[in-house]
Each structure stands twice: as structure tokens, then as C-alpha cells.
């Protein structure tokens, strides 16, 4: 019986080793790539938050002047045009540096200016660091979540909750759900646009609208 038990124990040990080896790539992804991805987003969020808070009054003032959105729309047009012409990169979360993430966060903070496309600005920044097009779109989308939540917290402190009615709360909930669905559709659409390099179409549109805005400012 001892040889049988010894053989059985040996088989179990071998199977455990096989399972551990097969499971290793998954464990590496969970403990390394995902963790690095989260850290990159956190690093990107820091400069975005600082710029967003520091430039809040400046952005509010810029929204009142038609010239500023016009200029920013033209800048967006240039960025989108560049994005289509950046060579495909191969960087995954592991290859992206924290310096890259910080600079991308700065670009998102600057994109709070009216007329600057947040997605266009951050995706162009991501592509310029060498990210794959798929990763650039996903990273741009994910990093927007803490930025949007942060902006919501800043704005919500001025809301008088005592004055809110149940209907208002329901509207906020419905609005949040709709925004989530629209966001999901947008990221799917953006993946197709970026992969097929169709940003030039939006670039032309932004250029035209920017020129119209600037013309309207001087005409008025």
C-alpha cells in the first residue's frame, strides 16, 4: 500500500505543479498588468485634478468668450489630424512609464478648456507615448471616470440637498444610467474610429466650426 500511496502523492504533486505553471500567466496579469494599469490612472488623475481646480475660474471665464472655444476647436482639429498620422505603437500597461501617465494627465487637465476635445486630446497624447490604438482608447476612457467624478464632487458641494425633491433624485439616477450607456457606445465607436484612422473627418468638422466661431466673435 505504501508504494501506491507514494505514487498517488507524486501524481498529485505533479498535477499541482502543472496547474501552478498554467495559472502563472493569469496570476501575472492580475498582480502586475492590472495593478500597473490602476497606478497609471491614479498618476494621470493627479495633474488633471490640480489643473482642474486651479483653472476652474479661468475655464468659466473662457466659456463666456466665443473666441476661446473657436481657437480650441482649431487646436482639436490639429490634434485629431496628428492622431491619424502617428505610427501604431506597441506599448501595453507594462511598457508605459509613470512619466507618460503624468503627461497624459496634464493633457486631460488642459482639455477642460472649452472647445478642446478631452477624448481627442488624451488619445493623441496616449498614441504619442507609443500605446497601441486599442489601449489608448481604453486608457483615455477609464482615466476620464475619476476626472468626471472629481468634477461632480466640486460642483455638488454647491447643491442644497434639502431643496432636492424625489423627482430630482430620480432624474439624477436616470441621467447617470443614460450617461453610462452612452459612454459604453462611445468607447466602442471610438475604437473603430481610431483603428481605422478616421479622425480626419472630425478634424475637418472641428476646423470649420472653429473658424465659424472665430468669425462670429469678430463679426459680433
Predicted regions and their residues:
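Small-residue-enriched transmembrane helix starts and helix-helix packing motifs
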Residues: 73, 93-109
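Hydrophobic alpha-helical transmembrane segments in multi-pass integral membrane proteins
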Residues: 49-53, 109-117, 150, 211-220
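Transmembrane helix exit motif
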Residues: 14-21, 53-57, 74-92, 153, ...
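Interfacial loop-to-transmembrane junctions
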Residues: 183-208
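Interfacial segments of multi-pass membrane proteins
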Residues: 104, 121-143
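Single conserved hydrophobic/aromatic residue that forms the stacking wall/gate
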Residues: 1-16
